A protein has these predicted regions:
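Helix-loop boundary and gating motifs at the non-cytosolic
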Residues: 1-33, 189, 198-218
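Interfacial helix-cap and linker-helix signal at transmembrane-aqueous boundaries
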Residues: 15-16, 46-47, 135-140, 248-249, ...
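Helix-to-loop junctions at the C-terminal end of transmembrane segments
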Residues: 39-52, 240-254
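Structural signature of the two symmetry-related core transmembrane helices
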Residues: 55-69, 256-271
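Cytoplasmic helix-loop-helix junction between adjacent transmembrane helices
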Residues: 87-122
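Core transmembrane helices of Major Facilitator Superfamily
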Residues: 87-98, 291-303
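Symmetry-related core transmembrane helices of the 12-TM Major Facilitator Superfamily/SLC fold
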Residues: 145-161, 351-367
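A late C-terminal transmembrane helix in Major Facilitator Superfamily
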Residues: 315-343
Length: 376
């Protein structure tokens, strides 16, 4: 995730430098989100039929390298869309496989603790990548984030070619799966919560960088290097708190983590909106990064653990594909909405207030979930 950190969070700034409008930047991000839809479902179905998790991850790495190469050298909107299309397909193949690999690889550690550790590793990679991207932005080499990503992907290819991911699933369960109607309805509220909650990381990758460089109602616009550092601050906070938060929530029902996440996101959005109403908005904006990081730290391991609890082992590939598809739905819709609001209003106050209300409303869905583990 080190290379992905720079690509995910700093691509909007790369093409802001190329004089793309907010709408065009977010259209590319939305295309990337929707491009992996078929790949996700296909990946999930094949995983449930016994495909080793290593195969989709290897394919994703090769496609992502092609996408990075396309984005390095283009200044045209068409080239930008092509690069985002390739990255979207790669993410579609990657996420169901890598998420399923966590519970399959973690014995004798519980899957909840394993997801907390995996999310901590993700946070380390993304934060390091984004901070490295901020340094590249300061040096005027912002497109270097794609070179970093290619390097990391090549290392991933070498590691997986030397040692494949384990797959201890019982073949008799895979050969005789339970009907979808026995488990899918119970998963639906969790998927709806995921669409809502994952809109926040999508907006942190798309709308927040543009909000920072455009400025608020009274808040001054930030230079691109300082904007990248602000995003890096949130990712650094996420890195610091991901492991302790994930460990604490691993001992509690999934509803606890989801409630904490939605409340934290609502508070962070309110602070982001408030930062636009003063010339001294930067301290308020920086303060908002704390609840936003807490919300993400609480949600990411809890959501994947909830899916494991709510789905049988022979359908967990498809369940992880549906979970990652929720990321894609919010990744498609949230940037499009954000781009339209930013272009129409010239600021992001309405966007942040809308998201705060949506997160508070999402608490109603949490009540429909029930923990499936015993806690002591």
């Amino acid at each position: 995730m080190l290379g992905a950190g720079g690509v995910l969070y700093l691509t909007p700034m790369v093409f802001h430098q190329a004089h793309f409008s907010a709408g065009r930047v977010t259209e590319g991000l939305a295309l990337a989100a929707v491009a992996g839809t078929l790949g996700r479902i296909l990946c999930g179905v094949l995983l449930d039929r016994g495909l080793n998790c290593s195969v989709p991850v290897l394919m994703a790495a090769l496609i992502a390298i092609a996408g990075d190469i396309r984005l390095i050298g283009t200044e045209a909107f068409g080239g930008y869309l092509q690069g985002q299309l390739l990255l979207g397909i790669a993410m579609g193949l990657y996420w169901p496989a890598i998420e399923l690999a966590v519970p399959l690889s973690c014995a004798p550690v519980s899957s909840a603790r394993a997801f907390a550790l995996a999310r901590s590793a993700d946070a380390l990679g993304i934060a390091t990548g984004a901070l490295g991207g901020a340094l590249l932005a300061w040096r005027g080499l912002l497109r270097g984030v794609y070179v970093v990503d290619i390097t990391c992907l090549l290392i991933l290819l070498l590691v997986l070619l030397r040692r494949a991911l384990p797959d201890p699933r019982p073949q008799d369960r895979l050969a005789h799966p339970s009907p979808l109607g026995q488990w899918l309805p119970a998963l639906v509220p969790m998927l709806a919560i995921t669409v809502l909650a994952t809109a926040m990381p999508a907006l942190m990758q798309s709308a927040l960088p543009l909000d920072l460089v455009q400025g608020g109602l009274m808040r001054r616009a930030l230079p691109e290097s300082l904007g990248a550092l602000t995003i890096g601050l949130q990712l650094g906070l996420l890195l610091l708190i991901q492991w302790p938060v994930g460990q604490a929530l691993a001992r509690r029902p999934v509803t606890t983590g989801l409630t904490l996440s939605l409340i934290s996101f609502a508070l962070g959005n309110l602070l982001l909106a408030a930062s636009a109403f003063t010339t001294w908005g930067l301290p308020v904006l920086l303060l908002a990064q704390l609840p936003l990081a807490l919300g993400e730290a609480a949600f990411l391991p809890t959501a994947t653990e909830a899916v494991v609890e709510l789905s049988p082992i022979e359908h967990q590939g498809l369940a992880m594909a549906l979970l990652s598809q929720c990321f894609a739905i919010s990744g498609f819709g949230a940037p499009l909405l954000a781009g339209r609001l930013l272009d129409a209003q010239g600021h992001a106050v309405g966007l942040w207030l809308l998201m705060a209300l949506a997160c508070l409303g999402g608490l109603l869905l949490v009540r429909d979930l029930a923990p499936r583990r015993t806690f002591g």
